[in-house]
């Protein structure tokens, strides 16, 4: 399902297309930052970690640029209900992407700290695995938004549950290790902060997925029972209702 339908105003189509293109660019940039920061941590690559920290401002600048374009779009075009819902989702989504960039920066800073203090004896395999999972979640959420695919968005919500469980399991294991051997407490705690940052990336991917369901069903599914969300997605899919389209 296309993210937008054609409108009578070609200039509106062009303006909206420009915003969506920047939105996708920002999302992919944020996902890339998470991957690069994690690689820098595991490889003890200080130069790459510092580049992630330095490049965070690029994501911030994109957020400001998209915000400005959204404000102009609303002021000039006064979008109707269906299009306004999409514009609202874009506005909310860039906040999540900006925060993903912030989490990548935190991971990079922890990488620099661990390089300075010496490697942690535990936790790197957990970081690698969780990083792979949340990056795929984020990319799937971006793809679901691009295609306005509520089923794919719901799969992201399911993945978030698995990520949360893995995060909790890894945290318990590392806390047990600290209690049994306190010689490397500060280093392991830095790894715990990295795991926390990755778990938050998963939460932001979930938020993007919820925006897809909002756009396609017209229902705000934040803080909604999981089974109820599944029903909404199924009903939307069965009925062929995609609320971002102007019929």
Set out the residue ranges of the language-model regions.
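Cytosolic, long alpha-helical scaffolding segments
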Residues: 1-247
């Amino acid at each position: 399902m296309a993210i937008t339908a054609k409108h009578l105003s070609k200039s509106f189509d062009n303006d909206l297309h420009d915003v969506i293109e920047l939105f996708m660019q920002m999302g992919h940039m944020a996902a890339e930052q998470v991957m690069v920061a994690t690689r820098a941590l595991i490889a003890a690559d200080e130069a790459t970690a510092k580049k992630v920290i330095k490049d965070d401002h690029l994501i911030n600048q994109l957020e400001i640029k998209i915000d400005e374009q959204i404000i102009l779009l609303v002021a000039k075009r006064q979008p109707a209900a269906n299009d306004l819902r999409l514009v609202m989702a874009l506005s909310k989504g860039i906040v999540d992407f900006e925060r993903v960039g912030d989490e990548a920066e935190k991971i990079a800073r922890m990488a620099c700290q661990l390089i300075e203090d010496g490697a942690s004896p535990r936790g790197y395999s957990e970081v690698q695995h969780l990083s792979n999972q949340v990056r795929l979640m984020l990319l799937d959420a971006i793809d679901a938004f691009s295609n306005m695919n509520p089923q794919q968005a719901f799969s992201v919500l399911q993945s978030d549950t698995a990520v949360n469980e893995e995060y909790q399991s890894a945290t318990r294991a590392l806390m047990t290790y600290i209690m049994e051997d306190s010689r490397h407490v500060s280093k392991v705690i830095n790894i715990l902060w990295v795991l926390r940052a990755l778990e938050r990336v998963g939460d932001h991917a979930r938020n993007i997925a919820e925006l897809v369901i909002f756009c396609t069903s017209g229902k705000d599914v934040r803080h909604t029972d999981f089974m109820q969300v599944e029903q909404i997605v199924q009903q939307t899919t069965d009925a062929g209702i995609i609320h971002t389209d102007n019929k």
